[in-house]
Structures are given as C-alpha cells and as structure tokens.
C-alpha cells in the first residue's frame, strides 16, 4: 500500500469497531439470509461516511512500526517513557490535534467497548509520527521508481482514490502548510482496487452472483475457510465467484476450468462467521463489485508447490489487523505484484482474471428505454403480488438509483436477474452479456417467468384460501345452528334419531337371543360415541346390516302341485328329471307343512337351461330369487365377508342375498360352481362346505356379522357343466341332477314354442305375417346348430328375423311412416318444448333424427305384407350350411370306427382311424404311432386295446401275423380338441381289428365302453348325451356296457326312438355284433401273400 494512503487507513481504524460490527454483522443478532443481507446493506448505507469503514478482525491490533521505518522505531523507543508527559504539549502546539481527539472521544461515547484513553493517546502519537514521515516516504517511493522502472507499485487503487489526497487528524504532504482549511472527508471508505490480477476462486452452485447484490455462501472446506480468514486479517478480502456448470455439483475448490463458467464476479468478503455445529466451515457474505473472466487457473496442487517460497511474515492472533505498512513493505520487496501470494500455502484454487467492460450504449436508445420501462412495469406487478419482492425493490431503488432509473439500465438488468428464479443457464447469460441492449431483454425474460410464478402462486393461494374459508364458514354455521337448537331445547345431532331408528327396526324383527344381545351392546356403544369418531361409522354400518337381515321373515310358499307343474312347463320344455325333483320337493313340504332347505346341483352342457330353470323353480315355489356366480372366484371374503377391522369391510354374498330378498327362505342360485378358483386369499370352495351342508348352515358365521345366521330354510341351487372339477367333499353335499343335451325333436319343440315367438317380438315382427317354416327350423338344427343346447339355435333364429325385418323395411320404403308421424304424443310435446328453448331448426341431419331420444311409435306394417322363410331361402338369411353331412364317413374303410364321447358341451361322435404305414414284408418291424391330442388316460386305453387285439389275433387267427410285422398309425380327428377318458377302449380295439382283418364296418354302428386287457367291458358315463350324439350322427345301433342298462331304460322314448341298443359285458359280444359276416378262413390268410414273399437278395431292402 502506498505510504500516502497510510493516514487515511489509520484514521479509518480509529472508528470503534463495535459500533459497526455489532449492529451489522453480529452473529447472535441476525441470521445470514437474503432478508438479513438486504437489511444489513440498508443499515450499512444509513451510517455516516465516517463510520462505514471497519476492520474484519475482532482481535486487538499489535502496536509495532512498519517494517523498514527505522526512524519511527527509534522515535517510539525514545518516547516510550514520555508518552503521558508530552501529550498535552503536542496538543497545544497543533490545534488540529484537538479536533482528532474530539472525534476519538465521540467514538468512545458511541461504543462502550472503545479503547481506553491510554491506548487512544498512543494511537494519536503514532498518527503524529506518520505525519512527520510522510515527506520522507514520498521521497523514498520516488527514488525507488526512478532507480528501477520494472518495480511495480504496491497496490494499485482506483483513479478517484489516487487523486484524492489522504486526510486525517493532520494534513500530510503539500497540504501541511494550509492551515484553517476545512476537510469534509475526515474518514473515507477504502476503495476497491480496479486491477486485481489474481484472486482465489470460489465455485458457486445453483445461481450466479450479480454486481451490487449481497450473497451469503457456505464454505465447508477447512483450507478455503482458513484462507478467507487470513485474507480478511490482511485487509485483502477479495475473491472471484464463478458458477458451476452442473447445478448438482458441490465443492469449494475448482479443479478444472471446464467445471465452471469462465465469467464470474469480483467480490468482497464483508463478513465471515463460523458454521454452527462445525469447527472448520464458515458462512461468508459476499458483495460483488464487477464482472471478471478467467484467463487461467492455478489448481490447488500447483498453488501449494510454491508455498514454501513465500514470505512467512504473518500477523499473530492477538492483533486487531495486520499493519498495512507491513503489507506494503512486504510487497515492495517482491519483483511482481502478487497480492494473493500468501494463499499459495493453502490448497485452494487461484485464477488469473481480467476485468470485463460493458460496451458503450446510448441511454436515449428507444430499445433501452422500452425494455427498461417494461422491466419496471413487471417489477410493479410482482410487487403487488409478493410483499417480499416489494421490499427488495424498495431497497434496491434506494441504494442503486438516487436519480432516474433510465440512467442505470445495466444495474436494472442485473437486478431483474438477481431477484428472479430462472434457469441456471438463463441467469448466466445475463451475467455474461456485456451488451446492454442484449442484457436487458434477457433480464426481462427471467423476470417475466418470475411474474408467472408469482401469479400462479397467488392463484393457488386464493383457491386454497377460498376452500378453507368455505369449510370454516360451514363449520361456523353448523356450530351456530347447534347453539340455536340448544337454546330452543331441540338440540339433537342426529345420533338420538339414529338410535331410535335402529330400535324401531329391531322391534319388527324376531332376532335370536344371541343376536339381540350383540345388537344391544353395539347400540349402547353407538350412543356413547361422538359422531366425528372413526368408530362411529363402523358401528353404524354394522347395526345397519344387523337390522336389515330378515330375522324371522319368510315368504308364503305355494305348495300347489298343479301350479308348479304349469309354471315349469310354461318356461321349459322337457327336463323331466328336474321337474319331477321339484314336484317331489313341493309334495314333501305340503305333507309336513314346512320346507327345509335343500342343495341341488344341475349338471349339463351349456345352453340347456340350467340357470333359467332356477328362476322357474323360484316362481313355482313363490320364493324370492337371488343369483351370483362363483366362476373364477378366488377370494374367500366374497363368500364369508371381511372382518370389520378392515376399511370398507362388507358381508359376504350370502348375507347380501338375504338383505336383498328380505326373507329367510329365498332361492339362491350359485352359478358355475365347477369353475371356482383358488388364490392366495384362500379357497372359496372350502368356504362353500359350511354353506352347503344342511347340518351346519343353520348357524352360518359370516366374518363381518360375527353372529350365527340360519340358512337351513334357504333352497340352494348350483349349476355346473362337469363334475370333475368340483371338489369331492363339496360334490358329496349336493344332490346331482343331470341335464343332457336336447335331441332334434326337443329342439324343434323349443324353437317353435319359445324361441321363435320371443325372437319375433324382439325384432318388432309380432303383428307381422312372417312365418319360419318347420322345414327351415329343422334345417337350422341339422346343418347349423348341432350342439347339445339351444343357445346357438336361439341366435340363428333371431338372425333370421332380423334379416326379415330389414327386408320388410327396405321393400316398404321410407315414406310409409314419416318422421313427423313416428313420434308419440309425449314425443311431440318434448320436441315442441325443445324447439321453444333452442329455436326452430331449419335443417336436421339424418344422424340427428336417428339418434333422437323422443318417444316414438311402432311402425304399422300393412296387412298385405307376407313373408315365409323356408328351407330353400334359409341361406339368404343365415348363409351356407356349416354341417353338410350327417356323418364324417358315408362308408367306412377298414380301420375306421365311430365311438361316442361326452364333453362339457354335451355328447359328440368320436371317430378312430387306423392305417398301415408301410407295406408288410417279412423284414418289417411292428409299431404304433398315436396322434389326435390324446391325453394320458386315452393313451393308456390305446396301449390296452393294442395289446388286447394282438391277443385276439393270436388266439382266433393264428395264421394272421399282421401285428407281428405291421407299422401302424392311429389317429382321432379334430386334433385341436384335447381328448381324454377311458370310454374309447372298445372303439380303438375295433379299429385295429378292422384293419388287421381288412374288414370294413357298418357306418351306422356307434359304440362306447371301457376295455380291460382281458376283454371286459366296463361302465361309462353320459349315456344319454352319447345317445343324443349318436342320433345326430345318423347312427342306428349303439353298443354300450351292460352295467349301463339302467341308464338306457331311463332314457325317454323320443331319444331312443329309431336306435337299437346292445348291452355287452365282454368284447367277444362286440366282435360277434360287428364281424358277424366275417369269413374266418379268409381273414386268416388275408396278409399271407405279403408276408410269404422271399426277401430280396439285393442290398436295397427299402425298395418295395
């Protein structure tokens, strides 16, 4: 530092430190943050100019002369003992000393912690010595400059500060002789150096710093924190702040210039406080002065290498601040100006920087004036929305713009970016922009975004406040209403009425004693609960369910046999077994006077009426009907309910059925019981065991109700397609009633009596002369709908009538019934009302007319319209036939037989084909290949049949060595359909024998039966369905096991009509029926010619 500036700094140091530090940056008084920094800046600027300079160190200053000033040191030594004696004399000799002394006293009066009078006198004495040595210092500096032009000045300062002369208690230099001249600048704020070539770089995260705006940062690196503290002690608290490119980066040292933006700010550390809870970190308050740019980086590793060569002279901890004369002397001795050389002993990042200068601009430019005005307007808008922003604008305007805003557009752009929450790169662009015309629009963009955020925040705040106010108003009104009711004596929160309602319901029900006890307990609990309590609603829902179960409520049953018969015949054709069982059930109830619940299970293929028969039974018995399906059900809670501890718990489907039916004796249909699933929530089929057990369901326990419910009076009807997938314990609890498929005669009767009339009414042809002839229905059944049920037949009949309706409307034309005549009186009134509201519609599209919701009348078809749909014209309505022949083969070749199968879809004809793969030769090897998607049981039946027929051939046809040399292939058509079951044994054996004996079979013979290896024919199931399938396939003879004779006798005559049945116990009986005309001698020699050929002598044995 120049010697000429020493007096000014010494005078500044005479200002009491506590007067400045305590109100501005006291650690206990303020938290460092945006608002505290603004407040600090405002209070700092409100101080007199003489009090704005302060030291950054709180330690006492060590009294010692500047290095190299031997005269001062000797004077100090000579006058060490005479300080007190000479003070008064010095004051008398120079009246200006009194002025300095009075200023010192003034400082002491302001700050109680000011130095004692002895210390003040010593400080005045040092100032006097400085005055006397000013001339000598100036001469010494001039001589040094003259001797070596390469030696730089100590510390360069700004032009204004170098031009201003130092002032203090005495005038130094040439002003010493000007007595009586008043100096208005007794104390001045030290100026910021205009040139500072090397600074310590501190990386900043999230957002850059802008000149003129304080920023508090946290330093956790101990080396950086220590370096900052030493910089402040040396009176050189200047750093460079540069923004991280990665917004997630963190650190206090710059490792590479690629990590930060090269444009930053030259900032002064105005204060540093230790971090709370951390020993090494500090919180530093930075005040940026100007923009700078990195020219080169000295990484931490490089800066510490030269740390040993720097001057080790440092100030002790007890000093107030290091003497500026000492620093100046240290720097003068060096060859180059390096104010940060003492930082090289720390592993911090140092950068060489250069100042950035703003490009000249015209303040009167229209663009600058327009953008400046817009920024001011946006600031005003934000200030109206955000009070904190309004305070920031007020402080900024007071500090930065003593005059007109348009005179400082650069500062205005910086302010816009500093207070906005824009993106990192947007703010950095504002900082890097040195062209004012470019910087202003960029600042305006980020400020506009801040305005949008403020508007959105205000909108959200208003919406939330409105909702809260609405709730508060409702709550206040409710409380006021309660108070009014309390004053009128009609106070009631609804709980008393609710309790009374439950009591009234319970009085109408015949609750069992155990249920009544639980009801009273829960009702008492409800009476003592607050309506706002969460358990209040749980108890209320439970009592609601408890009082909605029809305890003791029964529907009056109809035990009339004739009435039940009429109802069942009206709804269904056939189904004699089901109807007889229901009539038996009614007869028993009529004799006993009461009916106990039963569990029936209707088993049959789809479309035979299992579900609809349940509704007919309920109507015949005059019982309420409830149906639910358990197909795919995996949760036990659907049957037995959830426990009340769960949120949203409900009872099971059985309790829900009782609530809906409001009787204890409804008919509950459990559909698709064979398709019930199993999951991690449990096994619902096991839950049905208690429900469907007549010995246990008298005290069925639902998890939600937790009280026994009597289900013994409920008639349960289950439906299933097959019984194989029903668990055996569950199947044992149900009474099975099998519904076989319908034969052609039954389908014809059902179509004529039920399906056709319903389809005519559904398609609007009830009063139209449209006839579907009997031949057409027979053709539909024969060529389109061969399944066991009538569901597909119903679809085809509806399709025929729909086509007929379209044909009639097309032939009559659109003018038969105009749109204005198609509306009913109600529809016309609605249309007129709509026209009054919306006005007359000049043009209405056809689509709008077609989609009107106004009621319409039916079209009256003239009596002249007649339409008859016969067999010949059926293809015009339903397309070509699906099944063209009655059977797969009109004539069977050897090896083909027709068996019978029973599936979930009903009975079906199962053909078995066997062929010889290779020609028979003495060298050929036997074998059997099987195809047709056969499952394990059928594969075993194939092996049994193969072994059995080889035994038959060996015994009855020993000369026929067919199976010893034949490579065979057996196949069952429709390979996409999985096939399984043991009833195809005799069919496979017959197919192999027919091929071995080369004897074709009669195509009208069908067979079914399980075969053992000894030839025994065992019992099979589904004889009715298989008989129906045989009739559809055109069979006239059926071979079945003798054990199924009872099933055959129970078949209706219409099913057995035209079919001859043969019951067999051994396969020999089957052989006699099928091969009655067989010539055994010829059959013995049928393959003799092929097997007697001598083997070829050539090596080509494969040539046939």
Curated annotation (Swiss-Prot):
Cystine crosslinks: none
Subcellular localization: Mitochondrion matrix
Name of the protein in its database record: Lon protease homolog, mitochondrial
GO annotations of cellular component type: mitochondrial matrix
Assembly: Homohexamer or homoheptamer. Organized in a ring with a central cavity.
Compositionally biased region (Basic and acidic residues): 64-104, 125-144, 172-187, 308-317, 825-839
Region span, Disordered: 41-192, 296-317, 825-857
Role, per record: ATP-dependent serine protease that mediates the selective degradation of misfolded, unassembled or oxidatively damaged polypeptides as well as certain short-lived regulatory proteins in the mitochondrial matrix. May also have a chaperone function in the assembly of inner membrane protein complexes. Participates in the regulation of mitochondrial gene expression and in the maintenance of the integrity of the mitochondrial genome. Binds to mitochondrial DNA in a site-specific manner.
Reactions that this protein is recorded to catalyse: Hydrolysis of proteins in presence of ATP
Record keywords: ATP-binding, DNA-binding, Hydrolase, Mitochondrion, Nucleotide-binding, Protease, Serine protease, Transit peptide
Species the sequence originates in: Emericella nidulans (strain FGSC A4 / ATCC 38163 / CBS 112.46 / NRRL 194 / M139) (Aspergillus nidulans)
EC number: 3.4.21.53
Main location: mitochondrion
UniProt family annotation: Belongs to the peptidase S16 family.
Catalytic residues identified in the record: 983, 1026
Gene Ontology molecular functions: ATP binding; ATP hydrolysis activity; ATP-dependent peptidase activity; sequence-specific DNA binding; serine-type endopeptidase activity; single-stranded DNA binding
Transit peptide: 1-54
UniProt feature, compositional bias: Low complexity: 158-169
PANTHER family linked: LON PROTEASE (PTHR43718), LON PROTEASE HOMOLOG, MITOCHONDRIAL (PTHR43718:SF2)
Any GO BP: mitochondrion organization
Sequence ranges assigned to domain Lon N-terminal in this UniProt record: 199-451
Gene3D superfamilies per record: 1.10.8.60, 1.20.5.5270, 1.20.58.1480, 3.30.230.10, LON domain-like, P-loop containing nucleotide triphosphate hydrolases
Location of the Lon proteolytic domain: 891-1077
Record-listed ATP binding positions: 604-611
């Amino acid at each position: 530092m120049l010697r000429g500036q020493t007096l000014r700094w010494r005078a500044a140091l005479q200002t009491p430190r506590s007067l400045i530090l305590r109100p501005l940056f006291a650690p206990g008084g303020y938290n460092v943050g945006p608002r505290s920094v603004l407040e600090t800046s405002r209070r700092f600027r409100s101080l007199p100019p003489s009090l704005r300079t302060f030291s950054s160190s709180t330690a006492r200053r060590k009294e010692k002369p500047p290095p190299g000033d031997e005269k001062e040191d000797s004077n100090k030594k000579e006058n060490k003992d005479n300080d007190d004696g000479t003070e008064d004399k010095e004051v008398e000799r120079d009246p200006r000393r009194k002025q300095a002394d009075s200023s010192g006293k003034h400082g002491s009066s302001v700050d109680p912690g000011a130095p004692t009078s002895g210390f003040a006198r010593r400080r005045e004495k040092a100032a006097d010595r400085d005055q006397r040595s000013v001339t000598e210092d100036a001469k010494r500096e001039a001589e040094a400059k003259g001797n070596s032009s390469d030696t730089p000045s100590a510390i360069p300062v700004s032009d204004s500060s170098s031009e201003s002369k130092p002032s203090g208690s005495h005038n130094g230099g040439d002003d010493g002789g000007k007595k009586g001249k008043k100096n208005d600048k007794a104390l001045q704020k030290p100026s910021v150096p205009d040139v500072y070539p090397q600074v310590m770089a501190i990386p900043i995260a999230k957002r850059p710093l802008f000149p003129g705006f304080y920023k508090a940062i946290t330093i956790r690196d101990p080396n950086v924190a220590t370096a900052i503290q030493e910089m402040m002690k040396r009176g050189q608290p200047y750093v460079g702040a540069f923004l991280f490119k990665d917004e997630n980066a963190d650190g206090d040292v710059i490792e590479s210039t690629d990590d930060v933006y090269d444009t930053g700010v030259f900032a002064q550390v105005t204060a540093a406080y230790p971090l709370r809870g951390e020993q090494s970190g500090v919180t530093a308050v930075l005040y940026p002065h100007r923009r700078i740019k990195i020219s080169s980086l000295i990484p931490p590793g490089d800066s510490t290498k030269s740390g040993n060569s720097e001057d080790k002279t440092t100030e002790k901890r007890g000093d107030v601040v290091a003497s500026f004369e000492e620093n100046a002397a240290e720097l003068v001795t060096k060859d180059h100006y390096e104010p940060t050389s003492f930082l090289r002993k720390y592993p911090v990042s140092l950068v060489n920087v250069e100042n950035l200068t703003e490009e000249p601009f015209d303040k009167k430019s229209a663009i600058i004036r327009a953008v400046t005005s817009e920024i001011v307007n946006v600031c005003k808008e934000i200030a109206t929305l955000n009070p904190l922003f309004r305070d920031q604008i007020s402080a900024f305007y007071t500090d930065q713009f003593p005059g007109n805003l348009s005179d400082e557009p650069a500062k205005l752009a910086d302010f816009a970016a500093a207070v906005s929450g824009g993106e990192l790169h947007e703010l950095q662009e504002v900082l890097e922009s040195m062209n004012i015309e470019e910087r202003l629009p960029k600042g305006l963009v980020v400020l506009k975004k801040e305005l949008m955020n403020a508007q959105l925040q205000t909108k959200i705040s208003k919406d939330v406040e409105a909702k809260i106010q609405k709730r508060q108003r409702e709550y206040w009104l409710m409380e006021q209403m309660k108070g009014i009711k309390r004053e009128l004596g009609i106070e009631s929160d609804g709980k008393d009425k609710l309790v009374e309602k439950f009591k009234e319901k319970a009085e109408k029900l015949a609750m069992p004693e155990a249920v009544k006890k639980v009801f009273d307990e829960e009702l008492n609990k409800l009476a003592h609960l607050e309506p706002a309590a969460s358990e209040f609603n749980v108890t209320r829902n439970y009592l609601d369910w408890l009082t909605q179960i029809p305890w003791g409520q029964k529907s009056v049953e109809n035990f009339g046999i004739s009435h039940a018969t009429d109802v069942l015949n009206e709804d269904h054709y056939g189904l004699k077994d089901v109807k007889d069982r229901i009539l038996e059930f009614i007869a028993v109830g009529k004799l006993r006077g009461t009916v106990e619940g039963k569990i029936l299970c209707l088993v049959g293929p789809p479309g035979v009426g299992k579900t609809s028969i349940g509704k007919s039974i309920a109507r015949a018995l005059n019982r309420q009907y409830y149906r639910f399906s358990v197909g795919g059900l995996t949760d036990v809670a659907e049957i037995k309910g959830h426990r009340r501890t769960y949120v949203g718990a409900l009872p099971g489907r059985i309790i829900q059925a009782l609530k809906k039916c409001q009787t204890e004796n409804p008919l509950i249909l459990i559909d698709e019981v064979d398709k019930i699933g199993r999951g991690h929530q449990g096994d619902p089929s096991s839950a049905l065991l208690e429900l469907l057990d007549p010995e246990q369901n008298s005290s069925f326990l639902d998890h939600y109700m937790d009280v026994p419910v009597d289900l013994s009076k409920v008639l349960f009807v289950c439906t299933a397609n097959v019984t194989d997938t029903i668990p055996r314990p569950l199947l044992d609890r149900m009474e099975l009633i099998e519904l076989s498929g319908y034969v052609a005669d039954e389908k014809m009767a059902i179509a004529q009596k039920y399906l056709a009339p319903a389809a005519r009414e559904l398609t609007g042809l009830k009063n139209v002369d449209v006839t579907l002839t009997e031949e057409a229905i027979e053709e539909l059944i024969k060529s389109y709908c061969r399944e066991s049920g009538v569901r597909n037949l119903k679809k085809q009949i509806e399709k025929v009538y729909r086509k007929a309706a379209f044909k009639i409307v097309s032939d009559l034309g659109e003018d038969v019934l105009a749109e204005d005549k198609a509306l009913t009186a109600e529809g016309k009134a609605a249309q007129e009302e709509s026209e009054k509201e919306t006005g007359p519609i000049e043009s209405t599209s056809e689509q709008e007319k077609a989609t009107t919701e106004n009621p319409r009348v039916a079209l009256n078809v003239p009596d002249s319209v007649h339409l008859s749909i016969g067999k010949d014209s059926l293809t015009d309505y339903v397309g070509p036939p699906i099944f063209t022949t009655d059977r797969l083969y009109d004539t069977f070749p050897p090896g083909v037989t027709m068996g019978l199968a029973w599936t979930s879809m009903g009975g079906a004809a199962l053909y078995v084909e066997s062929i010889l793969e290779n020609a028979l030769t003495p060298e050929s090897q036997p074998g059997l290949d099987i195809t047709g998607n056969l499952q394990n049981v059928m594969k075993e039946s194939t092996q049994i049949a193969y072994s059995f027929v080889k035994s038959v051939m060996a015994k009855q046809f020993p000369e026929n060595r067919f199976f010893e040399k034949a490579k065979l292939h057996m196949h069952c058509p429709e390979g996409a359909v999985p096939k399984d079951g043991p009833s195809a044994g005799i069919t496979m054996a017959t197919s192999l024998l027919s091929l071995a004996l080369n004897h074709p079979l009669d195509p009208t013979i069908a067979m079914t039966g399980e075969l053992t290896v000894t030839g025994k024919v065992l019992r099979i199931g589904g004889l009715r369905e298989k008989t129906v399938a045989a009739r559809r396939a055109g069979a006239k003879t059926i071979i079945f096991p003798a054990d199924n004779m009872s099933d055959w006798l129970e078949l209706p005559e219409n099913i057995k009509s035209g079919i001859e049945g043969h019951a067999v116990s051994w396969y020999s009986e089957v052989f006699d029926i099928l091969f009655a005309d067989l010539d055994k001698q010829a059959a013995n020699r049928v393959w003799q010619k092929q097997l007697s050929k001598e083997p070829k002598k050539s090596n080509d044995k494969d040539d046939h």
